[in-house]
């Protein structure tokens, strides 16, 4: 059984960013909530949209920050502090340039890889990087100078379909993670590639 108590989906706020690659983490949390017939509601004290799920008999909070990406740690730290949730009880879903669309991977800890949302969360959790991550592949534009425009752009439908399929599999693997353990969830998710 997993000890995850908070699942966060990283995003930029507002309709103009809703369909951009950088919001893939929020797409995952929205899909997870939908699969349990829940919706997220804005809760200003946590600087985001929140919900509460019973996942495999465990009480789990969901959070999509309404801060800009580079301030995501403010929301995560507010909720973690209020509910006394430790970093290793947090799963952060985020877009990942180093994975192709259609692939998602779980991991514990590590650096921020240049991701400003992860960078701020690590900082606001007292420079503690030891939280779980769900890395949702969005691909890479091939040139570092094009990354900002790429993550703030909308994927073409062919890529969106692959990302959505990986997110659906990640939702199924989250249930395995909660019922069983991280290793079983990782083994299944890491074997998946949307085609």
From Swiss-Prot:
Keywords, comma-separated and alphabetical: Cytoplasm, Hydrolase, RNA-binding, tRNA-binding
Full protein name: Peptidyl-tRNA hydrolase
This enzyme's EC code(s): 3.1.1.29
Role summary: Hydrolyzes ribosome-free peptidyl-tRNAs (with 1 or more amino acids incorporated), which drop off the ribosome during protein synthesis, or as a result of ribosome stalling.
Alphabetized NCBIfam families for the sequence: pth
Organism: Pectobacterium atrosepticum (strain SCRI 1043 / ATCC BAA-672)
Any one cellular-component term (Gene Ontology): cytoplasm
Complex formation: Monomer.
Pfam family, one: Pept_tRNA_hydro
Residues annotated as site: Stabilizes the basic form of H active site to accept a proton: 95
PROSITE patterns reported in the protein's UniProt record: PEPT_TRNA_HYDROL_1 (PS01195), PEPT_TRNA_HYDROL_2 (PS01196)
Predominant location category: cytoplasm
Family recorded in the similarity comment: Belongs to the PTH family.
Active site, UniProt feature: 22 (proton acceptor)
Domain of life: Bacteria
Cell compartment(s), UniProt: Cytoplasm
């Amino acid at each position: 059984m997993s000890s995850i108590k908070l699942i966060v989906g990283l995003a930029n706020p507002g309709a103009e960013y809703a369909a951009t690659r950088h919001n893939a983490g929020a797409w995952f949390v929205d899909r997870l909530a939908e699969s349990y017939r829940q919706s997220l509601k804005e809760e200003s004290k946590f600087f985001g949209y929140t919900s509460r799920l019973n996942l495999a008999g465990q009480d789990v909070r969901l959070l999509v920050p309404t801060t800009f990406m580079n301030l995501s740690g403010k929301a995560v730290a507010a909720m973690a502090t209020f509910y006394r949730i430790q970093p290793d009880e947090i799963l952060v879903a985020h877009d990942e340039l180093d994975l192709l669309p259609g692939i998602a991977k779980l991991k514990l800890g590590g650096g921020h890889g240049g991701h400003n949302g992860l960078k701020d969360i690590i900082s606001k959790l007292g420079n503690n990087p030891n939280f779980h991550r769900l890395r949702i592949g969005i691909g890479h534009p091939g040139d570092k100078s094009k990354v900002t425009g790429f993550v703030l752009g909308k994927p073409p439908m062919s890529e969106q379909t692959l990302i959505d399929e990986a997110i659906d599999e990640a939702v199924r693997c989250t249930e395995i993670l909660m019922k069983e353990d991280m290793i079983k969830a990782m083994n299944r998710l890491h074997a998946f590639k949307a085609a």
